[in-house]
Design a protein with these regions (language model features):
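Mobile cap/lid helix-loop segments that border enzyme active or cofactor-binding sites
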Residues: 193-248
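N-terminal Rossmann NAD(P)H-binding glycine-rich loop of SDR-like oxidoreductase domains
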Residues: 1-23
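Non-catalytic, hydrophobic alpha-helical segments
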Residues: 12, 54, 162-166, 181, ...
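NAD(P)H-binding glycine-rich loop region in Rossmannoid oxidoreductase-like domains
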Residues: 22-86, 96-101
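Glycine/proline-rich active-site loop of Rossmann-fold NAD(P)-dependent oxidoreductases
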Residues: 132-143, 169-179, 185, 202-203
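Glycine-rich Rossmann NAD(P)(H)-binding loop
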Residues: 148-153, 179-186
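Conserved beta-loop-beta element that borders a ligand/cofactor-binding pocket
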Residues: 90, 95-100, 115-133
């Protein structure tokens, strides 16, 4: 089976490509570096020729509200048009849990991307926040030597748990719906970030702040976790930290 992975050289993409190739599939790791650009359309027709499945893992180079919305809308339209022309049979998109319940620009852009998907059998995978992004989350919430976080629940998932699920979903029949995935541990946001910072030797204090926002958006207790049944990964935060430190 020919499978095209858009964003195939990124964090999740590279792992997904490796898994699918090990299973014997013909996999194209598509990215601007390989001559495939979903914004300009360059290389899409050639990359998608003969493909049965497309996995969209592309991410915006900018997180500014207007720029990220334009990226996902333009990329999504170009990619889906190319898939229609190539008679692709399954479109898989990686998205984010709670994007329809959280008010920030990036989440709004991902929701707009989801809404573009029509006319092609599809599966949307909504994941909770990646463990690999914990440092960025802490930095974005920093106020001097303190990290201010809203009093909400958090359930991050490791990239090594996400990629196998993405590969499995891509090889299965389209669901024409949404699959939610999350990490195995649910705890308070500040507790998880505090554990992470302590483990890496970061002395910043983590505090609960009801006025704190998440990347500019207000969140409530369950805004960042699945509300119903979700498929859970196996890698705990402690295990992920152990693996990360072993690689360092």
């Amino acid at each position: 089976m020919k499978i095209v992975v858009i964003g195939g050289t990124g964090l999740i993409g590279s792992k997904t490509v490796a898994i699918l190739r090990q299973s014997g599939h013909e996999v194209v790791a598509a990215s601007p570096k390989s001559g495939v650009n979903t914004i300009t359309g360059e290389g899409l027709k050639e990359a998608l020729a003969g493909a049965q499945v497309v996995i969209d893992l592309a991410n915006s180079p900018s997180f500014e509200d207007k720029a990220v919305l334009e990226f996902f809308q333009t990329s999504g339209r170009n990619l889906l048009a190319a898939e229609t022309a190539a008679s692709v049979r399954h479109h898989v998109a990686l998205s984010i849990v709670a994007i329809d319940r959280t008010d920030n620009g990036y989440f709004r852009a991902k929701l707009a991307q989801e809404k573009l998907i029509e006319g092609i059998p599809y599966t949307i995978i909504r994941a909770t926040q990646f463990m690999e992004f914990l440092r960025g989350i802490a930095d974005s919430s920093a106020d001097g030597n303190r990290v201010r976080l809203p009093p909400v629940l958090f359930q991050p998932i490791a990239a090594d748990d996400i990629a196998p699920i993405v590969a499995e979903v891509a090889l299965a029949a389209p669901r024409n719906g949404i699959v939610e995935i999350a990490g195995p541990e649910r705890a308070s946001f500040h507790e998880i970030v505090a554990r992470y910072l302590k483990a890496i030797g970061d002395p910043r204090e983590v505090v609960r702040d009801p006025e704190a926002r998440y990347f500019g958006g207000r969140v409530e207790e369950h805004s960042l976790v699945p509300l119903s049944e979700a498929r859970l990964g196996h890698i705990s935060l402690d295990e992920w930290l152990r693996r990360s430190q072993a690689k360092a």
